[in-house]
Amino acid sequence: FQQGHQITTISQSPKTDVYANHLIQDVHQLDLTHLEPVDWVYVLLSPSQSSVEGYQQTYVDSVAPIVQALKSHPVQKIVVVSSTRVYGENAGERIDDESVIQPVDEQGRLLWKMEQLYQQAFAERCVVIRPTGIYGTSVARMIKLAATTQSYPQIHWSNRIHIDDLARFLAQLIHVEHPEPSYIVTNNQPVPLHEVIQWFQRQLNLPELVVESQKETGKRIYATRMRKSGFQLEHEDCF
C-alpha cells in the first residue's frame, strides 16, 4: 500500500493501520514540527455533526491551522476531499466537472469556502476531490430503508462511489504529473434512489415500494475528468 512512501496519519482517535505512523492530534492545534519533511498531503475531514456549525468548525475553521502547520514543509501537492454538495442543482440535472458551482445550502457554501481557502493558500499545488455518496463499509442503512419504505414520493437521482475506488483514485494521483485543479469522483451511473431500495427489497424478499410521483429531484453526476484520466473503476455499480 505504501508504494515506497513514508506515511503519517493524523486524527483525533487511535488507528491501527500497520502501513502508517499515526499521531493523535486535533487539526485545529496541528503541530507538524517533529515530522520529517512532508511533500504530499491529503485532507480528509468528517464533521461530528452535519449542522452548519459542524461544517464551519470541521471544514473552514481548520484551514488556517493546517496551512500554518504546513508552512515549514516542502509541500508539492495538497489533495483536499470536499463533496459534490457544492453543486446545488436538485431537479435531475446533469452535473460534470465543467458545471458551474452554485451551492444552495449553507453546508454546500461552507464546503466551497474551504475549497477556495486551500486554493488561495496553495494555488496550483492544490487538487480538490468531490466524491458523491460513498458506500462499501456497511449496508445497514439500505437494509433499514428496504424494511421500512413502502412508498417513495418522487424520482430522486442518487450517485455513489465505492470507498475502495475512491481510495485508489486518491492514491494514484501521486503518479499524475499534471493533475486537474479538481475532480468529481463517482461511478458514472446515476440511479434513482427508489430503484436501489427496491433492489434490496427483492434480495430480502420484502414488498417493493411504490413511487408516488414522476417528479425528478437530485442530480445526475458524471466524473468526466476522472474518466478522461484513464482511471478504471473496480466497482462500476452498487448492485
Describe each PLM feature range.
Residues 1-5:
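N-terminal Rossmann NAD(P)H-binding glycine-rich loop of SDR-like oxidoreductase domains
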Residues 9-14:
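N-terminal Rossmann-fold cofactor-binding loop
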Residues 19-65, 69:
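NAD(P)H-binding glycine-rich loop region in Rossmannoid oxidoreductase-like domains
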Residues 65-104:
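Conserved Rossmann-fold NAD(P)-dependent oxidoreductase catalytic core, especially the SDR/UDP-sugar
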Residues 86, 134-136:
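Conserved sequence/active-site signature of Rossmann-fold short-chain dehydrogenase/reductase
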Residues 91-129:
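Catalytic helix-loop patch of NAD(P)-dependent Rossmann-fold dehydrogenases
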Residues 128-134, 141-143, 151-174:
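Substrate-positioning beta->alpha
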Residues 167-222:
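Mid/C-terminal beta-alpha module of Rossmann-like enzyme folds, strongest
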